[in-house]
């Protein structure tokens, strides 16, 4: 149960972090963002979450020589802002 809660929160943090980065960031920046929000996870975990978000069409991924560059989709923005719901992503609280 706690693993599901943490996984859903990581996915939301990635989506919101992309919004804060003009809708695009590399995997290293996203790992730093996760760390800033209390998710000290490996690069493999970050990539796994990015791959899952891409499967849900919430982000697109460009692989540049083995390095991920991630772009938020309009659907991903809707989920990050709470206008749409996707099972597996934490529902956001309104931002102040």
Curated annotation (Swiss-Prot):
InterPro entries found in the cross-reference section: WH_DNA-bd_sf (IPR036390)
Upregulating conditions: Expressed in the late phase of the viral replicative cycle. Expression of late genes is activated by the viral late transcription activator C.
Gene Ontology CC annotation, any one: host cell cytoplasm
Domain of life according to the entry: Viruses
Broad class of where this protein is predominantly found: host cell
Localization annotation: Host cytoplasm
Keyword annotations from UniProtKB, A to Z: Host cytoplasm, Late protein
Name of this chain's protein: Uncharacterized protein gp26
UniProt organism field: Escherichia phage Mu
